[in-house]
Amino acid sequence: MIALIQRVSQASVTVNGEIIGEIEKGLLVFLAIEPLDNEQKAKRLAERVAGYRVFNDENDKMNLNVKQAEGNILVVSQFTLAADTSSGMRPSFTTAAKPEFSNHLYQFFVTQLRDKGFDVPTGEFAADMKVALINDGPVTFTLTI
């Protein structure tokens, strides 16, 4: 399971010309599911995302998590993060999980974050989405479980 997290001052996701999810200050999470992932991994990744200290404290050090920074989390499915790019000139997606399996774990991951008190707007699984963001920093990390 792979999460590319970006600290943002705002982010939104649009499907068919309509904004379906948006946040102000917080984390934009692009989530990829791999074939050997499971609910335990999704729960652990949700804990890491919620607890990851990437927001500045009063001393300008990355010492606050998203809740402490009074931010929110926008989650967008992104199977391309699981691509095999080790050779050739075209990515292979055989390393990404099948859609039905991925959707279940994607929804489970979102539920785990909501259970932690976040609103968690989302993109639409497997849809053609337009994602807009203002990256704050920029601050971007890849978390892998």
From Swiss-Prot:
PANTHER family: D-AMINOACYL-TRNA DEACYLASE 1, D-TYROSYL-TRNA TYR DEACYLASE. An aminoacyl-tRNA editing enzyme that deacylates mischarged D-aminoacyl-tRNAs. Also deacylates mischarged glycyl-tRNA(Ala), protecting cells against glycine mischarging by AlaRS. Acts via tRNA-based rather than protein-based catalysis; rejects L-amino acids rather than detecting D-amino acids in the active site. By recycling D-aminoacyl-tRNA to D-amino acids and free tRNA molecules, this enzyme counteracts the toxicity associated with the formation of D-aminoacyl-tRNA entities in vivo and helps enforce protein L-homochirality. GO terms for cellular component: cytoplasm. The gene is dtd. It comes from the Bacteria. Homodimer. SUPFAM superfamilies: DTD-like (SSF69500). The keyword tRNA-binding applies. A motif (Gly-cisPro motif, important for rejection of L-amino acids) lies at residues 137-138. It is an enzyme of class 3 (hydrolase). GO terms for molecular function: D-tyrosyl-tRNA(Tyr) deacylase activity; Gly-tRNA(Ala) deacylase activity; Ser(Gly)-tRNA(Ala) hydrolase activity; tRNA binding. Its EC number is 3.1.1.96. It catalyses: glycyl-tRNA(Ala) + H2O = tRNA(Ala) + glycine + H(+); a D-aminoacyl-tRNA + H2O = a tRNA + a D-alpha-amino acid + H(+). InterPro entries: Daa-tRNA_deacyls_DTD, DTD-like_sf. Keywords: Cytoplasm, Hydrolase, RNA-binding, tRNA-binding. One of its GO terms (biological process) is D-amino acid catabolic process. A Gly-cisPro motif from one monomer fits into the active site of the other monomer to allow specific chiral rejection of L-amino acids. This is D-aminoacyl-tRNA deacylase. Pfam families: Tyr_Deacylase. It is found in: Cytoplasm.
